[in-house]
Amino acid sequence: MNILFLTLLKIDTLEIRGIYHDLMREFSSHGHKIYIISPTERKENKPSSLSTEGNVHFLNIRTLNVQKTNIIEKGFATLSIEHVFLRGVKKYFSDVKFDLVLYSTPPITFTKVIDYVKNKDGAKSYLLLKDIFPQNAVDMKMMSKNGFIYKFFRKKEHQLYKISDQIGCMSEANRQYIYTHNPKINREKVSVNPNSIQPQPFEEISAENKAAIKKKNGLPIDKKIFIYGGNLGIPQGLDFLLETISATEKDPKMFFLVVGSGTEFDRIQKWFNQNNPQNAKLISGLPKQDYDDLMKVCDVGMIFLHKDFTIPNFPSRLLPYLEYKLPVLVAADPNTDIGTEVEKHNCGFAVLTGDIEKMKFALDSFCNMEDEKFEKLRNNSRNYLEENFLVSQSYQLIMKQFDLQNNNSL
C-alpha cells in the first residue's frame, strides 16, 4: 500500500525512536510505501526538503512555528498548516495513488488535505486521536466556550471526525468522551488504539554502572529517585510537582529528577534558582539516548496532569517508564483513566492533582516498600507495556479496521 502520514512532529528519519517513528517503521517493515509530511518550522531557518530512506519518503515542509511558541503564532500556524500540507501533496506526491491516509491530533485542521486525497485516490482515512481540541484549550482557560474562536475550532473538530473513516482513541475513557460529546458520531468507527512503541530488550544495569551514571549526573546513591521527564507546559500542572518537592524536602528517602523542556521551563528554572531545593535537580531537555540512560538509574516515573482537565488525557510519557520497568506515580485530574489503569495493572499509584497528603503517602509507600514487592511492581510495569502498547498491535488494529491484513497489494 501507499500510505500518507500527516503529523506536526518533525520526522526526517526513522532511525530514532518515538511513538510515530516506531509506528511508521512497523508499516515500513510490512513492505508498505510510506510518505510522511511534517513541518520544518520557521525558527529552523531551513527550506522545505524531500528525502528518502528505503521505502519511506520524508517531506519536511516549511511552516510557521508550531511547537513551543506563543499562542498567537501557534494559532496562525494551526490555521495555515492544512493549506501548506495540501500544496506539498500536490507538488511532491501528485503521481502517487494513496491507499490510506493516517494523521494525528493535534492539529484538527488537516481536513482539506484528507478530503483531497480521499477524493483523488479513494483512500481510507484513520485518525490517531491524541488530543481533544478545542476543549483542552477551554480547560486551560486559553479560550471561552462562548467565543468565536472556540466555535470555529469546534466546527473544525466535527469536520475532522466526520471525514475520518476510523478513529483510534488512546483509552476507553477517551472513547467514551468522544461518544458523549459527539452524539452524532457513528460509534462503530471509534475504537481504542493506544499510544504504542517498539520496546528495546531490557537489560538490568549493574550496580557499578548505576553508581557511575548517578555520580556523572549529580544524583544521590542512597535515595529513591523519582523522575519526571517530558514536556514542561501548562497542561502538566507542574505547580503540584513543585509543591511536592517543597513538602518533602526534609525527607531523606527520596530525590526528584525533572528533565524536559517547554513553555514552563523558564518559570520552573527560576523556582529552582530561588528555592535551591536539596532534594531535586532540574535538567533541560536531553537527547533520547541520554534520557534513556538516566531512566535506567531511576526508581519511579511520575506523570502530572492539570487538575482542571475535563478531557481524559493519556500521556505517552507513560510508555518509556514502563519500558524501563519503572513503577509509576500518577497525579492527575478525575476525568482521565491513566491512574486507574496503572493501579489496575498493579504497577503504581494514583492521586488527584493537588492532594498533597495522598501524594506524600504514595511517595512514602514507594520508599518504604519491601524489595520483593517493589520488584513485582517493576515486572508488572514491563508486562503492562508488552500486553497493551506495542506498535505491532497498533498496526494490526489499523489494518483490521479496513480488512487490509492480507491485501498489501492495494
Model-inferred region functions:
Residues 109-112, 116-120, 148-169:
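Membrane-proximal helix-turn-helix segments that form the acceptor-binding/catalytic region
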Residues 220-236, 242-245, 378:
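Conserved donor-binding/catalytic core segment of Leloir-type glycosyltransferases
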Residues 1-50, 54-57, 245-248, 410:
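N-terminal subdomain of nucleotide-sugar transferases
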Residues 48-50, 203-219, 372:
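A short helix/loop element that forms part of the nucleotide-sugar donor recognition site in Leloir-type
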Residues 14, 236, 287-296, 301-322, ...:
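Nucleotide-sugar-dependent
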Residues 251, 259-260, 265-292:
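Nucleotide-activated donor-binding/catalytic signature segment of Leloir-type glycosyltransferases, i.e.
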Residues 354, 358, 368-402:
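A charged, aromatic-enriched C-terminal amphipathic alpha-helix characteristic of glycosyltransferases
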Residues 40, 173, 193-196:
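Carbohydrate-associated surface elements
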